[in-house]
Amino acid sequence: MSNVVLPPALRPLTLLIAALCALPAWAAESDVASARPVPRLANGWVSFEAPPGEKGVWNRGDYRAVIPETEQQTALRDNFGRGSDPLNQKPRFSAVPFQPWARELFLWRQVHEIEPYGRCKPTGGLRHMSVPYGTDIVQVPEQQRIYIFHTGGSHSFRTIYMDGREHPSDLDPSYGGHSVGHWEGDTLVIDTVGFNERGWIDARGAPTTQQLHLTERITRLDFNRLSYDMTIDDPGAYTAPWTTGMVMNWTPESETFQFLCQDGNLAQELMVGGGSTGVDRTSPIVP
């Protein structure tokens, strides 16, 4: 029988059908991986790393801290069914205890979307954990430290001190702040202060000030899923603390890769402002 050549218009449909047919096998493989026990380090810590001899990174979840009023409160399936991001972990806009100026700024940012991340600036909180290049969490019990590496974009990393130290009293405000951590059962709890007000803690620009006290809770739900929750306690921008979160998925056989933000950024209008109509160097990175 001669080979059948499909018309170009049908080829994308054929590829889609083939991909859908492959989903059950992939889902079955994912179920097998989820059945693997949560790995631990020699000192008893839950491991967020790839098992010895294997590769893998944590893939980003939904990096919004707040969802619109009209969005359905359902669990969205990510990565062809390999994990879910429960939207009920995220508050609706009306439930966030904004101060008036912070609400106004948040709404302004939804229209203009001038995110510092698009200009190669560092991020914090949920946004630092949710990047398109994969996230590495490296645990060094010998040093009593945990590192969270963001190899793409701004090439930044965080150090979480696990040795019981207190926050310094004379911190200079920075994008990442100063982080100390401890374990509550199998949940890593990270306490961070010392932020400046220029970094965004999510992709939609929930405002923060230098009064921000961020508490993050990271739990490996099973082999394939990582629960991330953060509580924002910032009396400069909100009238009460509030919590949001996401679920991240393990991507096996993958590694973080280098992306040079300044050299690789093809959206020059985000770097200097003005779009295709010209360069507006007065456009603020953070209003």
Which stretches of residues belong to each language-model region?
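Bacterial N-terminal signal peptides
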Residues: R11-P24
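Bacterial N-terminal signal peptides that target proteins for export
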Residues: M1-T14
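PEST-like low-complexity, intrinsically disordered acidic/proline/serine-rich tracts
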Residues: I17, A27-P287
